Design a protein with these regions (language model features):
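Structural and coupling elements of P-loop NTPases
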Residues: 1-639
């Protein structure tokens, strides 16, 4: 086997919000990828998060790659005068985007694991690290944010070592061969990505490291091997991601394992069904910094994009036509959460100019999403204008709906459900392992909240700083609508994150929402006068003088049953007074629900109407008489 000394492929993995994308920024700046003239807008902060939604929410959704060209002292020591190209893959930290993580890891030879110096390793860290160890990738630990005033560096390093060893033990029990000595000897780099500084020595809690990112580059070069390949093997390249370019059409991102790829060549495409198809490579692009530049040929270990293959799919391989040897397909965790997405069926449908409202447009958009999103499944339902979309978690699905909303779609979205399975004849549901950090005084409230959702406490640790860390195993459907209740109970201070734990037998019924809904009983405009008289009955989620229709949920009833209300009632006026003057002072402001909150808020007989201009919660059956008949039938059936 030969290796390439002038190339390193690295994935940066961490829990959400521990600073992966910020570190990539600092690496690009210090290796000179941006010229002095570049504006902040062009480079900005978190260059890798290029989507609007990613910038707003501050999370990475798609795994992306960039190339850092490094020519510093560490490269000179290894005798590489021209420097080293480090291909960096920035992976998402959310387990909901697990499909992205697995694809990212199939492209690299080593992993940089980032851990927050105060929070320590969290569930998503465990998730990604397990995947990396399964693939036998060397690990470098970066303790980030060491300059936080509440950092506890030594504890976090020992927690991370414990995590590595316990994962190694788990995998050995499953029959996977792990080198435990190498896990004991994992290098640790102390860093502050935002300041762009790091060192190999512990700077002390809350202190800034002294050097720039040189020690990190040095550790990457020394610890992570160059890509290895077999000189006698024919071409083998794995498609790990898809992209589109307005000029070149569909692009496939490849990692070349063996052989060379040339622009204009004819190669074989090994399909999912085992057939080999002859394809022509019309354009070959390599990454430099954040730009893609055209190149004539690519060697083993390179991560490149090819154009000219229209229907190429993720997980397929490019092979030699004379001697085809396809690579194994990429496997992704099964989806755990599903929801129905269909066209907007409410009386307000089609009011927005230029909105996309036909079933055909929705179906085409969902099919387009399937191309690049490996962890998604779309299944037909009994209605021709709605589809069941399955994904890893409700965040991934809510982000798909939000993207469609911004593209001008009008949709009806059902409440998220779990995807159940029959295992050995027993109905089973997906479970999640949840880690919760809360101040001590909320311990009782949170234990009660989790018990109501069939959560089982596994461990409880007191950090001694007034904070407690709890670990629960809980059914995935217990976490639908959990976040809002959790933040209310802990007054916004709690931190909760979860990760898939496989399947377990069905846990029984879970009470989702203890309150009922206030439902509009006629169409019209919500009047401040009616809302003032109704506000002691509950809280509202619509604004005064907004339009409502029959069957729309306009508020929350503190009692457990639904109540039909007339929110359009007008005040009988004497001829001189203004209609609204004396009402607005006494009206409590309405709650504004975002898309995710609406999905959590909706009861089982409700769905969410999503248009480019508004998000509304409504009953599935709009007519009050019909709803009454259905409820009576259910009561009779339960007797």
């Amino acid at each position: 086997m030969s290796t390439r000394p002038d190339l390193r492929n690295v994935a940066i993995v961490a829990h959400v919000d521990h600073g992966k994308t910020t570190l990539v920024d600092a690496m690009l700046w210090q290796s000179g990828a941006f010229s002095e003239r570049d504006t902040v807008e062009k480079t900005g902060e978190r260059v890798m998060d290029s989507g609007d939604l990613e910038r707003e929410k501050g999370i990475t959704i798609l795994a992306k790659n960039t190339a850092v060209h490094y020519t510093g002292p560490a490269a000179q020591d290894l005798g590489l005068q021209d420097g080293v190209t480090i291909n960096v893959i920035d992976t998402p930290g959310h387990a909901d985007f697990g499909g992205e993580v697995e694809r990212g890891l199939s492209m690299v030879d080593g992993v940089v694991l980032m851990v927050d110096a105060s929070e320590g390793p969290l569930p998503q860290t465990r998730f990604v690290l397990r995947k990396a160890l399964q693939a036998h990738l060397p690990v470098i630990v970066v303790v980030n944010k060491v300059d936080r005033p509440d950092s506890r560096i030594d504890e976090v390093v020992s927690e991370t070592t414990d995590l590595l060893l316990s994962l190694g033990e788990d995998l050995m029990n499953e029959g996977i061969d792990i080198d435990v000595d190498s896990l004991m000897d994992v290098p640790v780099v102390y860093a502050s990505a935002k300041a762009g500084k790091c060192s190999l020595d512990n700077p002390g809690d809350g202190q800034l490291p002294t050097e720039d990112l040189e020690p990190l580059f040095e550790t990457i070069l020394n610890r992570i091997p160059g890509p290895s390949f077999d000189e006698d093997m024919p071409l083998q390249a794995h498609v790990t991601n898809l992209d589109a370019s307005p000029f070149l059409g569909r692009l496939a991102l490849l990692r070349i394992h063996n052989g060379t790829l040339k622009k204009g060549a004819d190669v074989g495409l090994a399909r999912h069904d085992g057939t080999i198809q002859r394809v022509h490579i019309s354009e070959l692009l390599a990454t430099e910094g954040l730009e893609r530049v055209s190149t004539d040929s690519a060697a083993p270990g390179d991560i490149v994009a090819v154009a000219g293959i229209e229907d190429i799919m993720i997980g397929e391989s490019l092979v030699d036509l004379e001697d085809p040897r396809p690579l194994p397909l990429i496997t992704v965790d099964d989806p755990a959460i599903s929801m129905t997405i269909g066209i907007n069926t409410s009386p307000m449908a089609g009011r927005v100019k230029g909105a996309k409202v036909t079933p055909r447009q929705v179906k085409d958009r969902l099919d387009r999403e399937l191309i690049g999103n490996v962890s998604l499944k779309v299944l037909p339902t009994e209605r021709p204008d709605a589809w069941e979309v399955q994904g890893r978690g409700e965040l991934a699905l809510a982000i798909l709906v939000e993207q469609m909303r911004r593209e001008g779609f009008e949709l009806t979205v059902g409440k998220p459900q779990v995807v159940t399975k029959e295992i050995d004849g027993v109905l089973s549901e997906p479970m999640e392992r949840m880690t919760i950090d809360i101040p001590e005084e909320y311990l009782g409230a949170i234990t009660q909240l989790m018990a109501a959702r069939k959560g089982r406490m596994e461990t409880m640790a007191n950090h001694g700083s007034g904070w407690i860390r709890l670990e629960f195993v809980v059914p995935a459907r217990g976490l639908i609508g959990f976040r809002t209740r959790f933040l209310t109970e802990t007054r916004g201070t709690g931190i909760a994150s979860s990760i898939s734990e496989g399947y377990a037998p069905w846990q029984g019924t879970i009470e989702q929402r203890l309150t009922g809904s206030l439902v509009a009983d006629r169409a019209g405009q919500a009047t401040p006068y009616a809302m003032t008289n109704l506000q002691e009955r509950g809280s509202f989620i619509v604004e005064p003088s907004s339009e409502v229709y029959e069957g729309q949920v306009v508020g929350e009833n503190p009692r457990g049953e639904d109540m039909d209300v007339n929110i359009c009632r007008e005040k009988k006026q004497t001829n001189t007074r203004s209609a609204t003057a004396d009402v607005y002072e006494s009206l409590t402001p309405s709650r504004k629900l975002t898309l995710e909150e609406s999905l959590e808020f909706a009861a089982n007989d409700e769905c969410v109407e999503v248009t480019p201009e508004a998000v509304r919660v409504r009953k599935v059956v709009l007519d009050a008489q019909e709803r009454f008949k259905i409820a009576a039938r259910e009561r009779r059936a339960n007797r």
